[in-house]
Amino acid sequence: MEARRHVALKESVRSIPDYPKPGIIFRDITTLLSDPRAFRRAVDALVHPYAGGQIHQVAGIEARGFILGGAIAHQLSCGFVPIRKKGKLPHKTVSMAYALEYGTDEIEIHVDAVRPGDKVLLVDDLIATGGTAIAAVNLLQKIGAEIVAACFVIDLPEIGGAQRLRDLGVEVRTLMQFEGH
């Protein structure tokens, strides 16, 4: 039964070939988000391992991590912390740079977003190289958070991001995998 649910969820993700460039297959979760049953199943599946646990905050990576993270935080009755691109937060922040295919980018968080020792669940829609997620983990740890796990709807295992997080000692949970880039 559980395997069938994940197949149905996987079918709710639109695949767009050659976007944003030739050879890439873009995995678009907006179709999953717009389907109330699929969205509910995805959120429930991500929440289930942590229900009744001691999660203090859910941290979501901009932008689709906000959608998923907000829903997960609501179900877990805990707070939500946005991790944003640099320059988007109004209060005092701490930032972390990370490598892109060509160049670097930077994410930030409010310095007081979590209290030291808070147990945090990191959420985003997809993990590929893991660069953004690793930067988010480092950023959260820098302000005192304890990372309980990192959760993603989609894993692209050939690219290796989930394994990179595991190699850092972070528990990783994903709902589905797609081959390719």
Curated annotation (Swiss-Prot):
GO terms for biological process: adenine salvage; AMP salvage; purine ribonucleoside salvage. InterPro entries: Ade_phspho_trans, PRibTrfase_dom, PRTase-like, UPRTase/APRTase. The keyword Glycosyltransferase applies. Keywords: Cytoplasm, Glycosyltransferase, Purine salvage, Transferase. Its EC number is 2.4.2.7. It is found in: Cytoplasm. The keyword Cytoplasm applies. It comes from the Bacteria. GO terms for cellular component: cytoplasm. PROSITE patterns: PUR_PYR_PR_TRANSFER. Pathway: Purine metabolism; AMP biosynthesis via salvage pathway; AMP from adenine: step 1/1. NCBIfam families: apt, PRK02304.1-3, PRK02304.1-5. Belongs to the purine/pyrimidine phosphoribosyltransferase family. Homodimer. This is Adenine phosphoribosyltransferase. It comes from Methylobacterium radiotolerans (strain ATCC 27329 / DSM 1819 / JCM 2831 / NBRC 15690 / NCIMB 10815 / 0-1).
